[in-house]
Amino acid sequence: MAKIDKKTKLKLNKKSVRAPSKPTTEKKPKKYVTADTLTWKPVKTSSFSGIDGGGGMMMLEELEDVGIEWEETDGGRKIAKFVEVESKTSKGKKNAAQEEPNQEGRGDDEKASSASETEEGKKADDKEAVEEDDEEEFPDFAGFAEEDLNAADEEEHPNLDDEPAFNDDLLPEWSSISLHPSLKRSFLASSFTAPTAIQSRAIPAGITGRDVVGVAETGSGKTLAYSLPILHYLLGQRKSKAGIKRPLSALVLCPTRELALQVMDHLNALLKHALATPDGEKPQGPPRVSVGSVVGGLSAQKQKRILERGCDVIVATPGRLWDLIKADDELATSVRTLRFLVIDEADRMIENGHFAELESIVKLTQRSTAQQGPDDDDPVFQAMATLFEESTAREDMQTFVFSATLSKDLQKNLKRRSRSWKGKGKRSSTLEDLVEKLDFRDENPEVIDLSPEGGVVSSLRESMIESTKDDKDLYLYYFLLRYPGRSIVFVNSIDSIRRLLPLFTLLQLPVFPLHSHLQQKQRLKNLDRFKSNPKGILIATDVAARGLDIPQVDHVVHFNLPRTADAYIHRSGRTARAQNEGFALQLVSPDEKSVQRALMKSLERTHELPDLPIEAGFLPSLRERLRVATEIEKAQHRATKATHDKNWLLEAAEAMDIDIDPSMLDGEDDDPDAPYYKPKKQDRGKGKASVENLKMELKALLQEKLVARGVSIRYPTSGSKVIVDDLIKSTGHGMLLGASTSKAYDQVEKTGKRKLGSGRPGAVKKKKVEGR
């Protein structure tokens, strides 16, 4: 009998075992789904609202196991459709179930290899499951389905009655304010040991149900003054039951996107410590209090999903919020039944071009809509008429209005709650119109006026330098070198920024622009660079004057004087924040003297600002540096303009489908009247060589030491100023040899000695000639 080897036997066994026929499966129909029904996962980004390394990309979400098909419409446009795709995990389980009956027909070797593969696959599945768990570790409530949110909320948060009490001895300054214990634990973790003046007065009124109108300088803690009563109320409420959407409790309206994101960051930072577990870790699951933002520049689709899943506090800008309200009746109902309405930076809000949207949002919160208004013919309000009949505004809604400026007359009228004060012959301001439309539930709102005398805080020192218009660059350069630190230079036009920026860049100063024509991504990047540089210089228009909380700003320079007192207050308020010292400098040219005098009178000043002492010995060297840098900047500007003109001519010709005469581009004729004037080649060569020579000259000037008068570099122990001790101890000025290291704050007194409008001592006064 022939011997059969093992391999032949294995082949025979395989042939004898007939493979089962594949079941005939029909192709499943495609299942289309909408974007709102999908489970979106938030993409983890870095801190500060996603701008640290995120390039301005914020609040991104991603999808898995979803296909996309593009359907072309009659007009040629393509519409994306989401197709449900079977996930890899479920598909793998089905395949394993189908292959299970076939395991008996395999050989021993094949079974062993299959077992090892199954074990490896199991490990891989476990690894994927762990990675998915890590991805779904809760960074934002928007990444969870509504059922998961409510179920996790029931499991993670204990009964509120079991909340442990807080030992007030740890924070004695907060003992008089009966806030939720979790908030006080957050204060302790954040080293927030004492409330500010506005907080100590606004918070007790807010937690007792009063309406509050607060007036305080910038940087005084107004954000927490209205946020803490809201969080105190929300933390005192019981958690929502499973399957019930979170109701919108508070709406915070801000004038700009940057301020709205900043407020949301403050709230989340406070809640992070307040809701932390005893071991200091962040609790798993959705937050007890959810905070979201609705601002322009981000995906409206994502913001709709956030609102649909439910949110306790919404921080929004009026424009984007009103766009969403017009498309969503449920959101309009949520706004109508608010528990808290906050208007932050009210004076800025009415200047930002969103007064119409703000007025419409405020109208939703009014208890009575019987009065006729200019928006009654709006189809949006007509569509909401039946909705308003079904839902009524809350009687216990609290309104918080905070601003850096508010007229005294308006404050008095708010206290009296007199509705007849507008028709006294005096035209009301837009801010007064806004406050008049607010339906305060409190008959006598708590008006807290902590605005400082003279419009600025006591820790701010002001000074001025009187110079000609052409010498402003020189004195600005001197100030930035003499007093290094984080400084903001305010100008009145974008053209001034475009002129100063290349000039001071050539002088090797860390300057960054900020104005409204910059893209949002570039604005955030420049702000981030300015914050990270302790000697950074921000040249900005009034877009940076309000709302932005930039820490540790040492100086504010008014290169051009503002036209209003409010703008001056907000500009100067970028420094001396949170009881820190600050310095504000005015550069005043002769044609601005009348503007400055009117500005000071509107601030109720009686004395001129003190002059900043100038060490004139440094000015000649600085003037020479500026002269060379200005020539370089002008030459580069001419070259850039010539290239721009040429490119414009080529693009215009291409758009009109015409040919250009080559002589217009390549001609050697030196004809300034030609459509495109092109200098001769030798002249262009001379221009390039001249710029290179100027750059070498500027480099040499920048390497030279700037020495004060009376100082000898070769003989430091002699001369009228002895600097040998400063050189040995390295205590002298880093840029100006022989200059003192005192701060600008210490160089001037709080108030000047000359009365406002009295003129300088020794100046020749013009005699008034009487007419005949």
Swiss-Prot record:
Residues 128-138, 663-673 have a biased composition (Acidic residues). Residues 103-112 have a biased composition (Basic and acidic residues). One of its GO terms (molecular function) is RNA binding. A motif (DEAD box) lies at residues 344-347. Its EC number is 3.6.4.13. Residues 203-424 form the Helicase ATP-binding domain. ATP binds at A216, E217, T218, G219, S220, G221, K222, T223. GO terms for biological process: rRNA processing. Its main location: nucleus. Keywords: ATP-binding, Helicase, Hydrolase, Nucleotide-binding, Nucleus, Ribosome biogenesis, RNA-binding, rRNA processing. It is an enzyme of class 3 (hydrolase). Signal peptide: none annotated. One of its GO terms (cellular component) is nucleolus. CDD domains: DEADc_DDX24, SF2_C_DEAD. Residues 1-30, 84-138, 663-689, 748-772 are annotated as: Disordered. The keyword Disulfide bond does not apply. A motif (Q motif) lies at residues 172-200. Disulfide bonds: none annotated. Residues 473-618 form the Helicase C-terminal domain. Residues 8-17, 752-772 have a biased composition (Basic residues). It is found in: Nucleus, Nucleolus. It catalyses: ATP + H2O = ADP + phosphate + H(+). PANTHER family: RNA HELICASE (PTHR24031). The Q motif is unique to and characteristic of the DEAD box family of RNA helicases and controls ATP binding and hydrolysis. Belongs to the DEAD box helicase family. DDX24/MAK5 subfamily. This is ATP-dependent RNA helicase MAK5. It comes from Cryptococcus neoformans var. neoformans serotype D (strain JEC21 / ATCC MYA-565) (Filobasidiella neoformans). The gene is MAK5.
